[in-house]
Amino acid sequence: VRRMLAELGFRSIDEAVGHAEVLDTDAGVAHWKSKGLDLSPIFAVPIDERGTRLPQRRRTRGQDHGLDHALDRTLIALAEGALEDAHPVRLDLPVRNVNRTVGTLLGSEVTRRYGAQGLPEGTIHVTLSGSAGQSIGAFLPPGITLDLVGDANDYVGKGLSGGRVIVRPPEDVLFLPEDNVIAGNTLLYGATSGEVYLRGRVGERFCARNSGALAVAEGVGDHACEYMTGGRVVVLGRTGRNMAAGMSGGIAYVLGLDPAKVNTAMVALQRPDPDDLVWLHDAVTRHARFTGSTLARSVLSDWPRRSAQFTKIMPTDYQKVLEATRMAKAEGRDVDSAIMEATRG
C-alpha cells in the first residue's frame, strides 16, 4: 500500500483522502454491462461557481437524518412513566409511510435503561393507525407491543429482540384480509425473539434468517423461511415457491401446503405430532385474539378437521440435533458429544 501511495505522490492514506483526480477506471475489469456508465461524478473534483478548485477534501457538514423529529421522540416522551418505573402505558397515535423504524428509538431507550431483559410483557402498548414505513418494530425489545391498524411496508420486525408486533386491517374493511397483502417483503429478517402476528398475506422472504421469533401470517410470497435457523412460523394460507431454501433450524407449519412449493434440500415434510398440535392451537388462538382474524377463528372452530391439514416443515439436521439431545439427556451422556456424533462432526 505504501508503494502504491508513493507512486501517486502521497505519504499516507490520510493524505490521499479526497484526491479524486488520481482515480481511474481499470481496463482489466471492463465488462459489457459497464458500457454507458458515467463515472464522472465519482472522479469529480470539487469546484466553486467560478470553477476554482476548492481546498475542502473531507466532509464539511454532517448528514441530518431527521432523528430529532422522528415519531419515536413522541413515543419516548409519552412513555416516560413506563421508562422511569415500568408503569404500564397505552398510547394511540397515527402513523404514515414516512415514519420509518417506528419503535426502534423507543426500544433502544428501554434497552439502555433495563438491559436486554427489557420490560415486563405489555408494559408499553402502542396502537398505530395508518400505513407504517419500512422497518416498523425493528430490534424491538421485550415489554413493547406495536399494534398497527392499517398496513406496513418492508422489514417489519427486522432484528426483533423480544417485542411484539401486530398488523391488522381496520375492522370496517370491505375485503377479505386473508386474500390481501398486509405487509411487504423480508419481514423478521434476523429476528432473535419475540412475536409477530399479521392478519393478511405478506411478501417475499418472510422470516429469512429468523433465529428465534414466532411469526403468524395468512399467506406468504416466494422464499419464505430462507436460511432460517430458529423460531417457529405458522402460515394459514398459500405460500410462494422455494420455501425453506437453506433452512437449517426452527420449524414451520403451513395450512394446506403445496409440497411442490418447498425446497426440500435441507428439510422434510411431516405431519405435526400431538405436541405440535397443542402448540399450534395456542399460536392460532393468540393470532385470533390479537388480530381478530376470522380465518384463524374458522380454523379453531373446526380444529379436529383443519388441524389435519397442517404440514410441518422440519430441517433434517435440526431434527437430528433435537433427537440426539433428547437421547443423551435420557441416557446421561454428554449432549455436545452426542450432537457432534449425530451431525457427523
Language model features with spans:
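Long, distal/terminal scaffolding or interaction modules
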Residues: 2-11, 17-20, 41-345
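Polar, glycine-rich mid-to-C-terminal structural blocks
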Residues: 24-27
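Juxtamembrane/interface motifs at transmembrane-helix termini
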Residues: 36-39
